[in-house]
Amino acid sequence: MSSSLVEVREPPPRRPWSPPRALLDVNVWIALLDDAHQFSEEANAFIESPEARIATCPLVENGVIRIMAMPSYSRGGGLPMSLVRQRLQQACASLDHTFWPDDVSLRDDTLVDFSRVQGHQQVTDLYLLALAVRDGGTLAGAARA
């Protein structure tokens, strides 16, 4: 098993001048959809690049809706789920977006080296990274304080 967390498989073919597609994590999406978010400016600068190519998956989409609809999301409370869903739909439609199904497993030793996971807080990121690498992309996440 390699020393990295994820075994790199042959990526799908892409145009040589295209950057890898970025699977945006929940934190990046929240920053994109909420102008009051502390990282909104950085997230928007990332996707406004002419080369920006993004991806979502069910895990990320569900997480965005769940978190932004929580009553404790902001001082004003959560947003209506239908509004968050609509914003997500509009953003995906306006960007170079593709949808990646959640179809990798952390039980797959050919895809991940689970022995390198140091704690429970890395499990979701490991899964998203495995999905992105398997599909020839990268994982774009917001820095956590």
Name each model feature, range by range.
Residues 29, 61-64:
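A generic structural signal for short hydrophobic patches within well-formed alpha-helices
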Residues 44-47, 88-89, 128-129:
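Short amphipathic alpha-helical segments and helix-helix/interface helices
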Residues 59-60, 144:
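Short beta->alpha linker loops
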Residues 61, 84-88, 125:
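A general structural signal for well-ordered alpha-helical segments in protein cores
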